């Protein structure tokens, strides 16, 4: 069995979400941080979008077959993948397949009527339809006017995706994908993702796929059961927080084998803020996640040191977004390493015990 296959199989995964622009400079810098991931005990690295994009977050992709120039070259990327695999770490790329950037070549060609990869209308059907000044038609953009909706039923789009899958899984040896906003795929979302998973598993049978479905568990689990991917369990994240913060009843579910358990991410308020920076509450919340679950677990960068809103920032309602995407505090890592009672050393212990079960 190849080294690559061993990395994938028989593993209770501890996924570590890396919000790339806040965590490291480039792929050389990230490769140098691999000993940190090994020390922490995580098994899988999820990289938020690394593709060319006009925004920092990168969820509006200009080219799915390239890397942001400031992140380095493909040689740098491949060297990072090789070093990760040498240390038995998996790497997941964040794929956005429900929309693209309006700067994507495919969208520019669609404006000229050269493909059916997006949705067009002569009339504004509702507020999700935006005017295109070049052809005077309306295009569908559910998120923002710079993020036109992809036609996931288009043969051209699916051909592109098949090439894309092979490009990253085979040529650049990534181990799987985190799939963005899966319920927003156009047409029949479950049919599309079932097709996608089938194409991935044909190329790499042991690839790891996990989808973002910000819904109650029954809905997100339906995607997992019917498509073959795993899904993040947003509902359980809320249950765990309510248990620790408000002493609400918490029931352990035995039907969540397809779920990935987590507490926060790049779209949410950090748990340190939820806990008002109370170290005991943060530790209790982490303990609850690791103790009463047998699923794969995902940790957001900085959670291991109780990172939160810097001084002078004002906490705002809704998504945590900007305030949850601040630079990784490496000085705090060094400080907590030396403190046997720190969150950092506590979560290391929890991870070790969890993997040993």
Feature-to-residue mapping (PLM):
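Active-site-proximal helices and loops of the catalytic beta/alpha 8
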Residues: 81, 85, 89, 107, ...
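Short, hydrophobic/amphipathic alpha-helical patches that form generic packing surfaces
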Residues: 284-293
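Short, flexible loop/turn elements at secondary-structure junctions
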Residues: 20-24, 51, 68, 97, ...
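Carbohydrate-interacting/catalytic domains
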Residues: 1-52, 78, 83-84, 245-251, ...
